[in-house]
A protein has these predicted regions:
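Intrinsically disordered, low-complexity segments enriched in small/polar residues
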Residues: 41, 97, 115, 130-132
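Alpha-helical structural elements
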Residues: 38, 104, 127-129
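Extracellular receptor-binding modules and their adjoining Ser/Thr/Gly/Asp/Asn-rich linkers
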Residues: 31-78, 134-138
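Fibrous stalk/shaft segments of extracellular and virion attachment machinery
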Residues: 1-40, 49
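A generic structural signal for short, non-catalytic loop/turn and secondary-structure boundary residues
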Residues: 33-36, 109, 129
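Extracellular attachment/recognition segments
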Residues: 56-117, 124
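Short, structured beta-strand segments at or near domain termini in extracellular proteins/domains
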Residues: 120-138
Length: 138
């Protein structure tokens, strides 16, 4: 009987250790999901534009979830900036405090990706060989 109790206690101890390990893993995953992340990146424009050539940023590897806010800015002196927020289907470039004409971008969100396109490469933030930086919060 003592040997059976000892075996039962060993099994209970092993089960308790496994439960504690899973609880710790679950708590860690909950913290990871709750912590806001900031991602900074850059790209070089390829000159394409329009619906068949959208610019896409994928945050799967960097944020691991959809971004809550994305800002894209030209580094090449024209000071254009594009702001993207989930749920937006359109966004326009801005220059300092001014709206820039003919820069309407159609925006789509899919999983951890955001894509946009405009009728011009500069409006789409994709001018050939121009440098762009972005940051995303997620």
């Amino acid at each position: 009987a003592a040997q059976a109790e000892k075996a039962d206690q060993s099994a209970l101890d092993a089960l308790a250790a496994e439960v504690a390990k899973k609880a710790t893993t679950a708590a860690l995953e909950a913290v990871r999901a709750a912590v806001t992340k900031l991602v900074v990146g850059s790209y070089t424009g390829n000159g394409s534009c329009g619906q068949s050539h959208p610019r896409t940023l994928d945050f799967t590897a960097t944020l691991g979830r959809p971004p809550k806010f994305v800002a894209v800015r030209s580094k090449d002196g024209d000071h254009r900036c594009l702001f993207l927020i989930p749920g937006m289907t359109n966004s326009n470039n801005h220059l300092s405090d001014s709206y820039i004409m003919d820069t309407k971008n159609t925006v789509t969100w899919s999983g951890n990706r955001v894509s946009w396109y405009a009728d011009s490469d500069s409006g789409q933030m994709n001018r050939l060989d121009s440098n762009y930086v972005y940051f995303a919060i997620g």
